[in-house]
Amino acid sequence: MYKKVVGGWFVYLVSTQISSGRAGSARFGGHLGYPSPSVAYIMARASRKANGSKAKSNSVQEYLDLISLQKQQFDQMRANYSHQNTQLAKSNSMLMIKITDLETKISELVQENVQLRSRLSVTELRFKERLNQSFNLLEHGAFQRFDEIVNLFAVVRAQQGLRPESAAATEQAQRRFKGLEQRGVSPKVVGFDVPSSDSVRGERETLDDRAQQHQEADSMELNVEETQPLRKKRRRSSRRESLFIPSDFDFSNDSLENALKEADKSRSAKDEAPSVAEDTITEEKHRESASRTTEQGESESRTKEASGTLTQSNEDGMGNDKSLQKEGTQQEDAANFTHSIIEYFIPEEYDVGSSDVANTSKSKLEVYRDDNEIESSQSTSSGECKELTGELSSAQPPFVQIPASSQSKIKHSLKPPRTSQRKIVVDEVMPHNDYSDATRPRRTRGKAVDYKWPSLRAKMRRPTDKLVDATTVTDIHELQVPTNRKLRKQREGVADSADVHGETDHEQDPEQSPAAEDVSVGLQSINSNIQKDEVSDQPLQATEVTQALPEDLPLRQPMALKDITNKIHIVQKPKKSLAKKPIIGDVSDENSYYGDDTSASGLRLNEGDLSVFDLIGGVKCSNIPKTHRARAKAERQVGKKPAFKVST
């Protein structure tokens, strides 16, 4: 009973029932009055046990409820955490994907940045190289121009017999120029060197030395090295190169050469430093001067002859003093000539420099001028040359002319445009209907087109109203092939009627071309042959058509090209109709195989007579059986019928 305890109330009921039963049994057992003490003790003990078990069961139940509640909370928290973990995993995966995309994009951007930097560096390097080249070119050109000016001054000094500049200053200038040429690359930073006191003193001393040398120069003597041709400098412009050729103005005189040789012997011991001309002499110029010695020899012979003719009248009463004066006058003439030539060429250099476009690149631009400007410049230059020669010839004896070989070497960059190589473009003109033989400018670029007669396409095809040549003379409708039979027959009839009436048309139109006459004659002969072959019973179709046509409709005359473009429509012979009285029973007739095969109408002798088969009614003609079996069957069904043949 105590093992199956559910609650406190059930235990209490059981204990009360037991106690009541025992009391009854004691009563009924003969014991009346109060119960015995043993029963009370048992009841008290049972009540105590029931209270203890009740308290224990309550505590266990509360513990179990608490455990179940904690378990539920734990499961719920675990589910929440698992769901949160899945969401975090998803977000983490998305973030990782985005991070990888960002990494790829960053790597692409880095590569692009590297490429852009490399391109930028390459472009900067190229720009610096171009800038450096342009600066080097400008510097080289500027120094070259200054060098040309210095050389020009030196040549003028040498020609005039002046003493040149000191050798130390010229060497210093040449060293500077050579140093700049060897350096090649201009410095990025321009530095200004402050001269020291020692350098200033040295320059002052050199200036004092120059002044003393100029004061000590008593005689104006020419040096052999100075008169020799200068080194042919490398110039950018061939026109500048052609302006002044010093070797062309070297005048060889025996007396002058002897005087120069003596002066050279006297001054060879004094001058230790080389002059400017010695540094500029090259082997190329020596070769050119050697090649020009022959030309100079001819010029010397001419000058000797000219001077001999002038001085023959004065040689009789003159002595050594006259010869010395003659040599002096020749020197003065040569100097004046060179001076005039230099003065003549210097303004031309200025004009060319001012008029031409500045060329910064190495390649030479081709500058073209108009013919009027070229002719005016040539006329002015020839006028100036004539004025110079007139002045010199009037005041001085004739001098040596410049040889033709040196003039042929002069190069000119300003050339007129070549008009012979250009294509002459002629405006195009539309063709006219009148086929005149007058010449007119053609528009075609390749070959001439003849518009007089229709092209081969118009002859070979059947054109329509849309596809017609613009210059065709023939009628399109005559070349067409009509699909309608009525129109075709009508046109054939019109053509035949035109052929029939060709004689009248020919008489009416006396101005017709001979080609049209020949065509009409040929057509008439053909039509006459056709008419002979036709049956006399059938009337002509052409006359019927011409009668059916209205009078106002003009007939088409035969064209000149009708025999070329059109085919002659030959009228076919009509099929002969069966005669009214045919010959029946002809042995040679192909159609009469058996008498029963012929039709009833074919056996009539006359239209009004009765035929043989009219007498026999219900007889039908059948085809001839081809096989023996079919023929026997036919004979069995229908008795044998003799072939009715009419003998003639």
Curated annotation (Swiss-Prot):
Residues 306-315 have a biased composition (Polar residues). It is found in: Nucleus; Chromosome, Centromere. It comes from the Eukaryota. Residues 95-122, 208-273 form a coiled coil. Its main location: nucleus. One of its GO terms (biological process) is cell division. Residues 188-239, 262-334, 367-443, 483-518, 628-648 are annotated as: Disordered. Residues 200-217, 262-273, 424-440, 490-509 have a biased composition (Basic and acidic residues). Pfam families: Shugoshin_C (PF07557), Shugoshin_N (PF07558). Keywords: Cell cycle, Cell division, Centromere, Chromosome, Chromosome partition, Coiled coil, Nucleus. InterPro entries: Shugoshin_C (IPR011515), Shugoshin_N (IPR011516). The keyword Ligase does not apply. GO terms for cellular component: condensed chromosome, centromeric region; nucleus. Plays a central role in chromosome cohesion during cell division by preventing premature dissociation of cohesin complex from centromeres after prophase, when most of cohesin complex dissociates from chromosomes arms. May act by protecting RAD21 and or REC8 from cleavage by ESP1/separase. Belongs to the shugoshin family. This is Shugoshin. It comes from Eremothecium gossypii (strain ATCC 10895 / CBS 109.51 / FGSC 9923 / NRRL Y-1056). The gene is SGO1.
